[in-house]
Amino acid sequence: IPQKTDAQYFFPPFVFANAKAYLHYSKINKVYSCYGEEGVYFDFLQKDDEAIDDSAQAPTYHIHTDLQQESEHFGAIVEKAKEYIRSGDVFQVVLSEQLCLATNLDSLTFYRLLSQANPSPYMFHFPTPYGDVVGSSPEILVDITGNQIHIAPIAGSRPRGKDANEDVRLEQELLSDPKECAEHRMLVDLARNDIGKFAEKGSVSVKNMMHVLRYQHIMHIVSDVYGNKRADVSPF
């Protein structure tokens, strides 16, 4: 599938960074951990008892994308993706659109507001030569702890209900949806295949198959796929 060339800004598909130092913050334990010889970069954390100024100028946004035009264009992309699937070129394709907007927020302030509006297990903020990357995701790409490889496929979702009873109803509806379940099983199979390329023979297993995790605004079907890493395989 060719790379799209009419993007409104350039950002490479991959950025490899050899960071001098990085910071990890556990929101559950409220613990900062600094790694690297240049941990002095994070000395400001010693002042983390100072209140954050929430009286700053209210955020403003101006959308530069023609949403109507993008919606019409997206329909054509869907049809093209179906052709790729029918021809056997792809098993799975993720379609996306680029939304560009101007704002008076710096990236760190945007990250802070994002963490309040959409708290997720995996949030990140890091600068690159092409721009700052900020994100909020419920899903890991891959976790390697010791010799264990872990992937947690997420596919299938419903919004959170207005109360506990509606949450239960939506969860049951989600788990009985043939399309959502088929998509999730496909991702579990892909995760098993991916881990199997680097794991010891016979060590790949699936646990907690198709359980539902609830987040602030949405619920997802999640499974856990594990394997024991071969001795000749590194995290890279």
Spans of features found by a protein language model:
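Extended alpha-helical targeting/anchoring segments
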Residues: 1-236
